């Protein structure tokens, strides 16, 4: 039987008034309807100025009035939406109800995959998170954006490009399962411009996830995953937990059993609408860019829900501070142990507390009750915290500190006193029975943790440094090698911007050049460039075939290697097209064989731009005939030629179909030469240059853009045709990094 939450006798006359207040609610709108995805607190929790009567604490009566109002809203809303709870009762999906900690993990994270050893390192990844913040319950494995669109691979092609292909994916998922971690993948319904999957996305996703035994799907940018996806998964006998990024409709809670919560937080915690409608619905609070996680964690703990512990944000490291990591460990430990309480249909949020700025939720379960508590104040709170109706034989345990409390009886109330530190947490258990062995174990664990206050842990956020991967000089040459162009040295203003879609100019966006103290989006540096020789054209298929014939080179990770070749050679008519589907390591191997090296990015830009700051290698004019446009189109037109025919274009015509067409021959656009006479630098295929690395991510700078422009979404890998722009491609493994839109050219150092 649930513990009775009785009103003290002194409030008995007012109870009738409260009943009269709420009685008409069955026939009228509620007073506290949700705003966006959050239910507002009662008015008594609003701080008023002295001229408005000052602050008056909420009473049990005002709390009951508010609770009755939002309960009425919930009951009515369930009826109006035809709420169906059957999916929350499916054994295959019940894991989601206790999946409190879920990072979005970029597949490029160096803790997840070791490209040198050529193997997934799931244990290393999970061990690191256990050490830093107490581990995870689920993981969202992200292999698509921001790289998708660099060629015509669709979202599933990108995942299948991961090392080992399907068998590698199945083993990797099994490794997470072995560690007790459920696995989700994203789906991008905005991906309508790359290769057609050949089947409807609901069926394609259901079949693929069953094949690799994944547990769920995150709906990227979606405000609800449509019912068709759940039905498709159930049809193949593999139910999936669907988790939209945005706020779904209330109706969608019948099939979307997970949700991200991307909210703005006030001092007084609001009630999560989705959690209130169905306490078994798991919400993962997500604030990818915030550096102080206190609001996220406190809101999650108050609402009994989870947190998206996302640190590697598109290759930009926004790491959890030691203080937030320790807070996460404590919140996760308590929530995992209390999971059965946190799905209680009798949840009472904003339970009346004595101390200002301390807020609690009450979670009854059979003959026990749990309170999850947060202190929103910047100062410690100690003393009389809460009252609960007196009941003979009830014992109270401070689970957070791992100690039993002695309640003070005041009339018909038991008053509990305990400390809760600034921006801290509390958890109280009321029980009439002897604590179980599990509760005793939890208390021992929490007592050990909380010997050190959260305030003892650093809350300073720090960026992690990046390093440029060195490029060994080539053998020096005194005269221009065949097929190369001399680039005389000179004074150069190297000015370039990263074109990442997200991240504004936060520290960590883009790259950190050797002369900079942090990664950032906008770069400018005056330098002296030494003379060198550059390939007049990108390396062609014929060039690469000579390399293979001479060396019998074959990479250990050969998935997608020369994907468009057959029987060891390129298609007819492709000899003079740029070689693609080669990784950075493949390109380096070719360069070493040829006595060359890959260029530093500033060398590439210097060869393309010269010293006059031109927009494109050939000047400041767009390169397309009348009636066609390139991106970007905001270029000067005064003094530019008007092309009358496609053959007159200075670079390839953009390819906007779902299937990427072959690249142009490297010598097809001689009029697009740079000031030094280097050809085919822009708009045919991207070209590998420098690699950057930090503790968690590797990336390569791509230059020149490509002919491929998938349509229908702003989220595809953006083009960088201008001389002062570059692309940043996140690296994982050769199989994944190889692309039909990326080639390379080489340089040689001059004596």
List each language-model region with its residue ranges.
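Aromatic- and carboxylate-enriched substrate-binding clefts and catalytic-loop regions
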Residues: 149-295, 301, 314-323
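Functional-site microenvironments in short loops/helix caps that host divalent-cation chemistry
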Residues: 487, 554, 559-726, 735-740
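An acidic-aromatic substrate-binding cleft motif
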Residues: 61-117, 143-146, 478, 483-488
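Solvent-exposed beta-hairpin/edge-strand motifs
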Residues: 388-402
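Active-site-proximal substrate-binding groove within the catalytic cores of carbohydrate-active enzymes
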Residues: 59, 67, 238-246, 250-385, ...
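C-terminal beta-strand-rich structural cap/linker in extracellular carbohydrate-active enzymes
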Residues: 412-447
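Catalytic domains of carbohydrate-active enzymes, especially glycoside hydrolases
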Residues: 124-144, 211-214
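Extended beta-strand/loop cores of jelly-roll/beta-sandwich
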Residues: 28, 435-602, 609-614, 640-641, ...
């Amino acid at each position: 039987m649930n513990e009775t939450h009785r009103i003290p006798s002194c409030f008995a006359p007012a109870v009738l008034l409260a009943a009269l207040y709420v009685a008409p609610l069955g026939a009228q709108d509620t007073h506290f309807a949700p705003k966006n995805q959050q239910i507002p607190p009662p008015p008594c929790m609003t701080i008023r100025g002295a001229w408005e009567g000052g602050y008056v604490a909420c009473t049990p009566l005002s709390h009951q009035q508010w609770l009755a109002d939002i309960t009425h809203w919930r009951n009515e809303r369930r009826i109006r939406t035809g709420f169906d709870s059957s999916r929350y009762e499916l054994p295959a999906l019940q894991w989601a109800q206790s999946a409190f900690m879920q990072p979005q993990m970029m597949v490029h994270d160096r803790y997840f995959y070791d490209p040198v050893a050529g193997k997934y390192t799931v244990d290393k990844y999970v061990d690191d998170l256990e050490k830093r913040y107490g581990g995870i319950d689920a993981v969202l494995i992200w292999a698509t954006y921001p790289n998708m669109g660099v060629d015509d691979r669709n979202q599933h092609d990108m995942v299948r490009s991961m090392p080992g292909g399907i068998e590698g994916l199945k083993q990797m998922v099994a490794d997470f399962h072995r560690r007790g971690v459920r696995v989700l993948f994203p789906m991008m319904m905005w991906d309508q411009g790359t290769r057609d999957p050949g089947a409807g996305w609901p069926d394609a996703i259901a079949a693929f996830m069953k094949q690799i035994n994944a547990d769920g799907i995150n709906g990227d940018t979606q405000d609800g995953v449509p019912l068709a996806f759940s039905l498709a998964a159930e049809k193949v006998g593999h139910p999936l937990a669907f988790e939209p990024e945005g706020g779904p409709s209330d109706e969608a809670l019948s099939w979307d059993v997970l949700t991200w919560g991307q909210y703005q937080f006030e001092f007084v915690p609001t009630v999560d609408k989705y959690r209130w409608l169905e306490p078994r619905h798991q919400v993962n609070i997500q604030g990818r860019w915030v550096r102080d996680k206190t609001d996220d964690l406190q809101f999650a703990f108050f609402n009994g829900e989870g947190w998206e512990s996302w640190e590697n944000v598109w290759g930009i490291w926004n790491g959890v501070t030691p203080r937030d990591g320790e807070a996460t460990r404590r919140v996760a430990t308590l929530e995992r142990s209390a999971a059965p309480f946190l799905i209680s249909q009798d949840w009472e949020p904003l339970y009346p507390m004595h101390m200002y700025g301390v807020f609690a939720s009450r979670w009854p379960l059979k003959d026990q009750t749990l309170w999850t508590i947060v202190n929103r104040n910047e100062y410690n709170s100690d003393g009389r915290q809460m009252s609960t109706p007196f009941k003979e034989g009830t014992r109270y345990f401070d689970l957070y500190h791992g100690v039993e409390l002695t309640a003070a009886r005041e009339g018909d109330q038991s008053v509990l006193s305990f400390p809760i530190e600034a921006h801290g947490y509390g958890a109280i258990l009321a029980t009439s029975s002897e604590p179980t062995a599990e509760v005793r174990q939890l208390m021992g664990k929490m007592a050990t943790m909380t010997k050190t206050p959260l305030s003892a842990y650093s809350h300073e956020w720090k960026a992690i440094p990046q390093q440029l991967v060195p490029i060994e000089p080539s053998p020096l040459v005194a005269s221009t090698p065949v097929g190369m162009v001399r680039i005389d040295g000179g004074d150069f203003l190297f000015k370039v911007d990263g074109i990442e879609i997200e991240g504004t100019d936060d520290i960590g966006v883009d790259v950190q050049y050797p002369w900079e103290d942090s990664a950032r989006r906008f770069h400018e540096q005056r330098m002296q460039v030494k003379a060198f020789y550059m390939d007049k054209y990108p390396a062609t298929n014929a060039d690469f075939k000579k390399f293979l014939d001479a060396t019998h080179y074959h990479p250990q990770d050969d998935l997608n290697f020369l994907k468009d070749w057959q029987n060891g050679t390129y298609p007819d008519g492709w000899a003079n097209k740029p070689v693609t589907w080669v990784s950075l390591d493949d390109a380096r191997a070719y360069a070493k064989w040829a006595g060359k090296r890959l260029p530093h990015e500033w060398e590439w830009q210097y060869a393309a731009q010269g010293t006059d700051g031109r927009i494109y290698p050939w000047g400041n004019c767009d390169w397309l005939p009348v009636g066609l446009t390139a991106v970007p189109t905001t270029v000067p037109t005064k003094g530019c030629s008007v092309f009358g025919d496609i053959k007159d274009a200075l670079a390839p015509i953009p390819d906007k179909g779902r299937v990427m067409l072959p690249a142009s021959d490297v010598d097809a656009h001689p009029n697009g030469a740079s000031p030094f006479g280097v050809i085919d630098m822009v708009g045919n295929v991207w070209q590998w240059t420098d690699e950057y690395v930090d503790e968690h991510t590797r990336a390569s700078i791509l230059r020149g853009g490509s002919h491929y422009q998938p349509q229908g979404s702003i989220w595809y890998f953006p083009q960088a045709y201008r001389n002062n722009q570059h692309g940043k491609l996140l690296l994982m493994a050769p199989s994944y990094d190889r692309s039909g839109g990326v080639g390379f050219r080489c340089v040689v150092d001059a004596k």
